UniProtKB/Swiss-Prot annotation:
GO MF annotation terms: S-adenosylmethionine-dependent methyltransferase activity
Annotated keywords: Methyltransferase, Transferase
Pathway terms, separated by semicolons: Mycotoxin biosynthesis
The protein's name in its UniProt record: Methyltransferase ucsB
GO biological process: methylation
Source species of the chain: Acremonium sp
Binding residues annotated for S-adenosyl-L-methionine, in chain numbering: D87, D121, A122
Record gene name: ucsB
InterPro entries: Methyltransf_11, SAM-dependent_MTases_sf
Amino acid sequence: MIIQGNQLDSLPKAEDWEAFAESYKRIAEVAVMKPVQALLQCLDDRLPLSGAVGILDNGSGPGIIMSSLIERYGPQLPPDCVLTCVDYAPAMIDQVDKARIKAVEEDADSAWGRVEGKVLDALDLHSIADESQSHIAAGLLYNLTTDPAKCLSECKRTLQPGGVLAVSAWEGNDWIEMLRVVPLIKPDLKTAIQPKWSTVDAVRWDLELAGFREVHVQRIPIKIPFTSHALFVDTLMRYQPRMVAMLRTFTEDEKTELRRLLMNEMKVICPSQPGMMSGAVMVGAGVR
């Protein structure tokens, strides 16, 4: 696919995540906690985390998976197990670093003290050695990259033989579907706002094609509570990276009109306020 100049301007950049990082952490903790717990369970079921050599949180964001890992499995982890978070957005790794500092201040023996944050592209994990990881978690990552096969290949390269990769991918969610109103204002953004949804079969196929075995994929439904339509839409427009990137090309009048359209769309999807927005995440795992 050829990306036109105005579409390129609408793609999120690493710096777009800076303002979003803290709010994303709060939202994501609610949105993806069930899939995160399922992802960690997949890792532990296939290869007990009590014997982990290295655990990589690939595309870590602010460290939600790592935080859940340490909270749930921290006492079981071997003392020499290397813990690493990587993300292409420096603002997200800043959040990881803040979480580590806070955790160690509260408990000097916390496994957080061993967490290293690195700014890396998931398509080029050059500072992660071959066969150095026993477990890799890639939450809501691989199918959102420009080259999903390369992302999975890099995961496989860094995994030890017998190591486990657990991934997740959106089947769909209401709040991103709301963006279908954007082309009513800017028709040229129709391609840019198309979401990258997946299915159980697609995730299974991707993992098997990448060479992973004993692949299993499950569907996890989720709900995100909101207090009012206006607050949810304003948060979406102010902090969601894809939205922030698109709004660079909007005039103030266009932003006002977009807010109105988003409010109307949200009321169709979920008329009551407060209410719940719905979505579903695929969680899959495979062994190298």
